[in-house]
Amino acid sequence: MRIVALEGIDGSGVSTHSRLLHARLAGAGVKSCLWKEPTEGPVGRLIRGFLRSTEGVDSDLMALLFAADRLWGLRLGVVERCGGSPEVLVVDRYKYSSLAYQGVGSGLEWVDAVNRKAPEAEILVYIDVPTEVALRRITARERREVFETPEFLERVKSMYEEVLRLARARGVKVIRVEGVRGGVERGIEDVQGEIAERVFEALGLARA
C-alpha cells in the first residue's frame, strides 16, 4: 500500500484536494482509497469532540489520541472501509499533522516518538498557503475548531518546515504546491492540476 499524504495548515484546502486527487486516481484505474484523520473510529470520535470544544486542549493528550486513532485506522479501519489493502491510500492529513500541530506544544521529538509505529508516507503533498489567506477561508465557515487561531496557525506553519525537513531526511518524496502565486490565490482546478500531475509522476503512473 502506497501512502500519499496531503498536508497543510487549516484553511489550505487539504480536504478538497485529497478528495479530488483520489477521484483522479480512481478515474485512471488505480485502486485508490480516501482516508481522513481524525477517523470515524472510537478514538476519532473522541478527538472530534475535543476539537469542537471551547475549552483548552492538552497537547500531550491530543498527540496520544491522534497516534492511537492513526494506528486503529491503519490496522483496522482502512481494510474495513477500503475492502482490503488499496494500491494507493490518499490520506487527508497523516502523522505529519500531529508533528506540526502537537509538536508546537509537546515538542517535535516526543510527538515523533509516539508516532513511530505509523509508517512514513511515500509522498507528502504540502499545500503552502499564507496564514492570512487560510484564516479568511476559515472565517467563512460556520464552525471553527480549537486550533484555528492566527497565533497558533502561524506557529504551526513554522513547525511544518521542520516536519518537511524531517520527512525528506527519511526518504519521503515531498511535493510543495503553492496555493497562492504572485500574491494571487490560485483556483482549485489549477492547484489540483499541479498536485495530480506531480503525484502521478512520483508514483510512476501515466499523466493525470
Swiss-Prot record:
<dbReference type="InterPro" id="IPR039430">
    <property type="entry name" value="Thymidylate_kin-like_dom"/>
</dbReference>
<keyword id="KW-0808">Transferase</keyword>
<dbReference type="InterPro" id="IPR018095">
    <property type="entry name" value="Thymidylate_kin_CS"/>
</dbReference>
<dbReference type="InterPro" id="IPR018094">
    <property type="entry name" value="Thymidylate_kinase"/>
</dbReference>
<dbReference type="GO" id="GO:0005524">
    <property type="term" value="F:ATP binding"/>
</dbReference>
<dbReference type="GO" id="GO:0006227">
    <property type="term" value="P:dUDP biosynthetic process"/>
</dbReference>
<comment type="similarity">
    <text>Belongs to the thymidylate kinase family.</text>
</comment>
<keyword id="KW-0545">Nucleotide biosynthesis</keyword>
<dbReference type="Pfam" id="PF02223">
    <property type="entry name" value="Thymidylate_kin"/>
</dbReference>
<dbReference type="GO" id="GO:0004798">
    <property type="term" value="F:dTMP kinase activity"/>
</dbReference>
<dbReference type="GO" id="GO:0005737">
    <property type="term" value="C:cytoplasm"/>
</dbReference>
<dbReference type="GO" id="GO:0006233">
    <property type="term" value="P:dTDP biosynthetic process"/>
</dbReference>
<feature type="region of interest" description="Defective ATP-binding">
    <location>
        <begin position="8"/>
        <end position="15"/>
    </location>
</feature>
<protein>
    <recommendedName>
        <fullName>Putative thymidylate kinase</fullName>
        <ecNumber>2.7.4.9</ecNumber>
    </recommendedName>
</protein>
<keyword id="KW-0067">ATP-binding</keyword>
<keyword id="KW-0547">Nucleotide-binding</keyword>
<dbReference type="GO" id="GO:0006235">
    <property type="term" value="P:dTTP biosynthetic process"/>
</dbReference>
<dbReference type="InterPro" id="IPR027417">
    <property type="entry name" value="P-loop_NTPase"/>
</dbReference>
<keyword id="KW-0418">Kinase</keyword>
